[in-house]
């Protein structure tokens, strides 16, 4: 064997060391009582995930109840209720137009009714609405219920910075994991192949296979031929990357709008990845560094998001038009959110409280540009401050 082949095998061994992935096939024990699933949220990504879940609930009748409820914040589209459009035409014409939804996916405008007798809740709403949703759900969700958060962001309050999955667990008393990955919603909805990561820690009160949600059940719930799922336990790792990638993407949008090209975008992503990992090490030491490199929820998601997601588009328009972030968001996103705008403020507030702002110059630069109109052209100097501090 050549020296080059030896090096390749050695590198492969390092990359895969300690990596535990579930296989693409799912071997399941029939549930004693099929799990009833509800998706809370009906935006672009919420509807896409609801489509995936409904397809799998129909495909595994021995494991899941066939009907999937999707809570919809009711709107009127040309005089028709959005829920009625979804339930009769099987399309979300506002947030996911052109995509046919499964007939077992039922839009429900009543939040409390949508979670009646539920076993699994998938949260997929803009994260700023989570406290209000949890407040409404309190007292209506049994402790046996399990949840997955597809939200991107943090909850920052008197208790410090919290993962949104932890916030859900604390507020509702239910075990909650997370789903995150290199997933542009429209591409997933169009059934173009992609990967994602689901993270879930089996709780101490696990009731047993066939009676409770485990990694096999979650694999069956989310895995599709076009949507490949890796199930791991590092909820913190995938949640951190899922939140902070949007802040990095704003930085990429700024330099793109300034016309600085691919080299500048790559520099932002390099610095951003370092700050994401540093944030995890400092504030969530239970997160695993390999998650950032090896999972779809890590560097792959960062690359995809920085290639042209909502945050890049908003930041690019800010740079080219001189408009503020909120004008650009309203103009571009059809009522949806660029989550990085909120996350960068939450991160700034937390870092300021901890006295750690100087350790995260890119995150701070993005915050100052969005909220205090710092000149975008100063980004390189602001980022280089980290090296000065380390010297």
Swiss-Prot record:
Positions bound to NAD(+): 41-46, 73, 129, 185, 310, 339
TM ranges: none
Listed SUPFAM superfamilies: 6-phosphogluconate dehydrogenase C-terminal domain-like, NAD(P)-binding Rossmann-fold domains
Induction, as annotated: By osmotic stress and by methylglyoxal in a HOG pathway-dependent manner.
InterPro entries: 6-PGluconate_DH-like_C_sf, 6PGD_dom2, G3P_DH_NAD-dep, G3P_DH_NAD-dep_C, G3P_DH_NAD-dep_euk, G3P_DH_NAD-dep_N, NAD(P)-bd_dom_sf
GO molecular function: glycerol-3-phosphate dehydrogenase (NAD+) activity; glycerol-3-phosphate dehydrogenase [NAD(P)+] activity; NAD binding; protein homodimerization activity
Record's subcellular location: Cytoplasm; Peroxisome
Coiled-coil regions, chain positions: none
Cytoplasm keyword on record: yes
Keywords of the record: Acetylation, Cytoplasm, NAD, Oxidoreductase, Peroxisome, Phosphoprotein, Stress response
Positions where N-acetylserine occurs in the chain: 2
CC terms in the record's Gene Ontology section: cytosol; mitochondrion; nucleus; peroxisome
Keyword rRNA processing attached: no
Pfam families: NAD_Gly3P_dh_C (PF07479), NAD_Gly3P_dh_N (PF01210)
Effect of residue 183 to S: In strain: WFB
EC numbers on record: 1.1.1.8
Residues modified as Phosphoserine: 24, 27
GO biological process annotation, one example: protein import into peroxisome matrix
Effect recorded for residue 143 to A: In strain: WFB
Catalyzed reaction equations: sn-glycerol 3-phosphate + NAD(+) = dihydroxyacetone phosphate + NADH + H(+)
Protein family per UniProt: Belongs to the NAD-dependent glycerol-3-phosphate dehydrogenase family.
Function: Catalyzes the production and accumulation of glycerol during hyperosmotic stress conditions. Glycerol acts as an osmoregulator that prevents loss of water and turgor of the cells.
NCBIfam families: glycerol3P_DH
Note: Present with 807 molecules/cell in log phase SD medium.
Name of the protein: Glycerol-3-phosphate dehydrogenase [NAD(+)] 1
Source organism of the structure: Saccharomyces cerevisiae (strain ATCC 204508 / S288c) (Baker's yeast)
Lineage, opening ranks: Eukaryota, Fungi, Dikarya, Ascomycota, Saccharomycotina
Gene (UniProt): GPD1
């Amino acid at each position: 064997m050549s020296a080059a082949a030896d090096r390749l095998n050695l590198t492969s061994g390092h990359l895969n060391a300690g990596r535990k992935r579930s296989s693409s096939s799912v071997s399941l024990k029939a549930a004693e009582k099929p799990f009833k699933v509800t998706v809370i949220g009906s935006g672009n990504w919420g509807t896409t995930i609801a489509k995936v879940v409904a397809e799998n609930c129909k495909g595994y009748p021995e494991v899941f109840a066939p009907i999937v409820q999707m809570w919809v914040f009711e709107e009127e589209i040309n005089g028709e209720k959005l829920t009625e459009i979804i339930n009769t035409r099987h399309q979300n014409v506002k947030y996911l137009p052109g995509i046919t939804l499964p007939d077992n996916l039922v839009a429900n405008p009543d939040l409390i009714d949508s979670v009646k007798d539920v076993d699994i809740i998938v949260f997929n709403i803009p994260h700023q609405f989570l406290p209000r949703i949890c407040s409404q759900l309190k007292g209506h969700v049994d402790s046996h219920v399990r949840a997955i958060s597809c939200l991107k962001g943090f909850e920052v309050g008197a208790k410090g910075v919290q993962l949104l999955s932890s916030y859900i667990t604390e507020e509702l008393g239910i075990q909650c994991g997370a789903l995150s990955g290199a997933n542009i919603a429209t591409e997933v909805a169009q059934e173009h192949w992609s990967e994602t990561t689901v993270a879930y820690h089996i709780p101490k009160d696990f009731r047993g296979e066939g009676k409770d949600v485990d990694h096999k059940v979650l694999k069956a719930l989310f895995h599709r031929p076009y949507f490949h799922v890796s199930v791991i336990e590092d909820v913190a790792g995938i949640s951190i990357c899922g939140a902070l990638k949007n802040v990095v993407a704003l930085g990429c949008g700024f330099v793109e709008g300034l016309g600085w090209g691919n080299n500048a975008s790559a520099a932002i992503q390099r610095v951003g990845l370092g700050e994401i990992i540093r944030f995890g090490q400092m504030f969530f030491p239970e997160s695993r560094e390999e998650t950032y490199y090896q999972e779809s929820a890590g560097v792959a998601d960062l690359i995809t998001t920085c290639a042209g997601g909502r945050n890049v588009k908003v930041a690019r328009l800010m740079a080219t038009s001189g408009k503020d972030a909120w004008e650009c968001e309203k103009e571009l996103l059809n009522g949806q959110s660029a989550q990085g705008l909120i996350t960068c403020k939450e991160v700034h507030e937390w870092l300021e409280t901890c006295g750690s702002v100087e350790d995260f110059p890119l995150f701070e630069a993005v915050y100052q540009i969005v909220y205090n109109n710092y000149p975008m052209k100063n980004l390189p100097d602001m980022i280089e401050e980290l090296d000065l501090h380390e010297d």
